[in-house]
Design a protein with these regions (language model features):
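Non-cofactor substrate-recognition interfaces
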Residues: 1-11, 16, 89-99, 106-414
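Glycine-rich loop/turn
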Residues: 70-100
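Conserved beta-strand residues within beta-sheet cores
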Residues: 52, 73-77, 103, 184, ...
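Gly/Pro-rich turn-and-neighbor structural signature
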Residues: 11, 18-66, 71, 77-83, ...
């Protein structure tokens, strides 16, 4: 170590599994607990099915964790329910009207319970054809993104005589709306395998909806996205959950990264909430091939099979490959999911401003490290997910009564 220029105390080393070190951590955790900065939360977190544990924001931002991957994407068609509230959207239309929503994770579509629009974004109603089936259809999407799906040169093409598969799909823009005016409109579930409890399948507004890509309409699956969960709660949208054999409410995907098998669900829940025939076709399938040791990258993915089902049912407008940046687990090198988990957190956001101020007092070498990577991390700070589902490491010194009516945080073995 001397030749390496590495300073280390070999006589009294810093070892994380040493009881003195663990007790020091217990003391610090107890102090945080007294100050109300240590809490248990049920939130959407980065989760590694391959490692079987949640990951912290810091772990996810290590070099190399985000990488470009090519996935199957789908622009899905959500049929609007025609009722008194939506009647104005059907003016001059004989058939059905749809919302178009794009996703890079088609496996989350069965868990959809809402669609989000930008309150100030302008949307257009377009009359055209389904390029896969050739059937006439009328759709809503953001005005700024209309050219990505309906090139201007096709606007003057004749509307009669179009055949499925034709590259140039004729269209007409028939109306313009503001996002906030679409809020509350109901639509039919895209894949009605499992019935959620509560007021689902309606349009809500979201402050994070943009017109940078997609259609300007965001598919919301509250169990698999932090932003989805936040805007859904704000609008009273329920998540789509299943009930397992132990009576616990779970997302449709289990901890290993696959759709729950029917035999692992509560029989009464299956009887009252599940279309067993439709869901059974995909039950037990892994959402990513990387989680299944029997599959390779060359095997068909769940995303592809779901997209083909939607295409066959006339519920897909565009299916294509798309390269995007996706997080991977630094331990297993496999993709992570955003997943609802019980975890213990340190409320770092409560001292965010002070952390940023103190960071500016540090004489970083080079300076760009402090203002760049570390500074940006502090600016986007979230509460620290502290707990891990593993058998090594420092045990959390928190004890609770069976009814969780009383909690104690032990700060010392003494």
């Amino acid at each position: 170590t001397r030749r390496m220029g590495y300073w280390i105390d070999m006589k009294d080393p810093y070892i994380t599994y040493d009881n003195k070190y663990i007790e020091t951590l217990w003391h610090l955790l107890a102090e945080l607990y007294k100050k109300g900065l240590l809490y248990k939360g049920y939130t959407i977190q980065p989760y590694s099915p391959a490692a079987g544990t949640g990951l912290s924001n810091h772990e996810l931002n290590q070099p190399g964790c985000y990488r470009d991957v090519k996935d199957t994407t789908c622009t899905a068609l959500f049929r609007i329910v025609r009722d008194q509230q939506s009647e104005r959207l059907f003016k001059g239309v004989d058939g059905d009207v749809y919302f178009m929503a794009w996703t890079t994770t088609p496996w989350t579509l069965p868990s959809n319970t809402a669609l989000a629009v930008g309150p100030a974004i302008r949307y257009v109603r377009v009359r055209s054809f389904n390029p896969y089936t050739g059937a006439p259809l009328t759709v809503f999407l953001a005005k700024d993104l209309c050219p990505a799906y309906f090139p201007k040169k096709n606007e003057d093409l004749p509307m009669d005589g179009y055949e499925a598969g034709g590259k140039n799909v004729p269209f007409r823009v028939e109306g313009e709306y503001v996002g906030k005016d679409l809020a509350g409109i109901r639509y039919e579930p895209l894949l009605p395998w499992i019935a959620p409890d509560g007021d689902a399948f309606r349009v809500i507004t979201g402050d994070y909806v943009t017109t940078e890509d997609g259609t300007g309409i965001v598919h919301i699956a509250p169990t698999f996205g932090a932003d989805d969960d936040r805007v859904a709660k704000q609008s009273g949208i329920p998540p789509l959950v299943v009930v397992d054999r132990a009576g616990k409410r779970q997302p449709m995907v289990d901890r290993t990264g696959k759709f729950f098998r029917l035999e692992d669900l509560d029989p009464e829940f299956v009887r009252t909430h599940v279309d067993a025939a439709a869901y059974g076709e995909f039950a037990g399938r892994f959402v990513k091939n990387a989680y299944d040791p029997t599959l390779s990258e060359a095997d068909p993915t769940l995303d592809v099979d779901l997209c083909m089902k939607l295409k066959f049912e006339g519920k897909a407008f565009r299916i294509e490959k798309h390269t995007h940046n996706y997080p991977h687990c630094w331990r297993t090198d496999k993709p992570v999911l955003y997943y609802p988990l019980d975890s213990w957190f340190i409320r770092t956001t409560a001292v965010k401003d002070r952390l940023i101020a103190l960071n500016r007092t540090i004489d970083w070498k080079p300076e760009s490290t402090g203002s760049g990577r570390f500074g940006k991390w502090l600016e986007n700070l979230v509460d620290w997910n502290l707990s891990r589902s593993r058998y090594w490491g420092t045990p959390l010194p928190i004890w609770a009564t069976e009814d969780h009516g009383e909690l104690k945080c032990i700060g010392s073995v003494a």
